[in-house]
């Protein structure tokens, strides 16, 4: 299983948008995603409630809800057959919570908007991930997503100069697009739309998807405790225990040719909108 954490204590950076589109992508690929909502606003939970019957299944956990009758560890259990756990964190996240939330994460994605305030907040966030959460650079688990960018603007160039100094891979550059608003309102993701409607946006996700495909999955024994606290992950029994299998291929009959190409893609290059000279090299393949 992969645990992918979307994290940036600065509100409005696009964590939820990226989380729901990742979940829908994995669902269409048949990779059994679980979407955990840690934000009291419940945005990802509301998005899940809008999904129509017949859409690819995504298991949801409203982890922000408090229930005095059960422990937090019990309430945040993950189904055993989950292959991709996507964690959407809250804004104004307290620094001391970082070790618990990022524990066992195979990837921590930090969305950054092109503004001076967001650049400063991202620098602090990444510093805390390194110093407080104790995630080492050489583990190649932290990556940045340049979000809602408008190419050829001065602030975009300033953002890319800043990201160059981090020595953290920039795995996607996503444009400011109304398509994200439209799909969210209908409980869908980009990868569930007709390719000719969202092709440009889908193409910008390919480097991120390729980078995530290189992450080493977690090998977690059934029933081990704790997902946001403790030392290991807490899991729910699967409805039908699944035997270990190779990652499901991306079906060209379901996905567009643009996205199905990810199945055989080489290690992720920089996005088309990203100047390769400003982007740290992609992480090497693990395992």
Please give the residue ranges for each predicted region.
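Extreme N-terminal, non-catalytic leader segments
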Residues: 1-7
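P-loop/Walker-type NTP enzyme "switch/lid" segment
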Residues: 7-13, 20-99, 103, 184-188
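Motif I (Walker A/P-loop) of helicase-class P-loop NTPases
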Residues: 16-20, 122-123
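Inter-motif core of Ras-like GTPase G domains
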Residues: 96-116
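Conserved C-terminal guanine-recognition region of P-loop GTPase G domains, centered on the G4
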Residues: 122-137, 147
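Beta-strand-loop-alpha "switch" segments that mediate conformational coupling across diverse proteins
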Residues: 150, 160-191
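Inter-lobe coupling/hinge region of RecA-like P-loop helicase motors
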Residues: 182-201, 206
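P-loop NTP-binding site
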Residues: 216-287
């Amino acid at each position: 299983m992969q645990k992918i954490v979307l994290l940036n204590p600065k509100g409005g950076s696009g964590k939820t948008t990226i989380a729901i589109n990742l979940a829908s992508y994995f669902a269409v690929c048949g990779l059994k995603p679980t979407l955990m909502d840690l934000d009291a606003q419940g945005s990802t939970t509301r998005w899940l409630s809008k999904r129509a019957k017949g859409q690819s299944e995504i298991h949801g956990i409203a982890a922000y809800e408090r229930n005095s009758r059960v422990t937090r560890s019990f309430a945040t259990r993950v189904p055993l057959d989950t292959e991709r756990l996507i964690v959407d964190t809250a804004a104004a996240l307290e620094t001391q919570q970082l070790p618990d939330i990022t524990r066992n994460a195979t990837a921590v994605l930090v969305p950054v908007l092109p503004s001076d305030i967001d650049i400063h907040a991202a620098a602090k966030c990444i510093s805390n991930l390194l110093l407080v959460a104790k995630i080492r650079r050489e583990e190649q688990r932290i990556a940045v997503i340049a979000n809602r960018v408008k190419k050829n603007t001065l602030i975009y160039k300033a953002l890319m100069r800043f990201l160059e100094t981090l020595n953290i891979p920039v795995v996607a550059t996503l444009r400011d697009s109304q398509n994200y608003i439209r799909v969210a309102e209908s409980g869908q993701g980009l990868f569930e739309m007709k390719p000719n409607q969202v092709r440009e946006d889908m193409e910008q996700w390919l480097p991120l998807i390729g980078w995530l495909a290189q992450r080493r999955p977690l090998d977690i024994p059934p029933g081990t405790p704790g997902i946001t606290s403790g030392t290991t992950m807490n899991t729910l029994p699967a409805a039908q225990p699944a035997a270990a299998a190779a990652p499901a291929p991306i079906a060209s009959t379901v996905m567009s040719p643009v996205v199905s190409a990810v199945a055989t893609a080489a290690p992720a290059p920089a996005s088309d909108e990203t100047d390769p000279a400003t982007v740290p090299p992609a992480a090497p393949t693990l395992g």
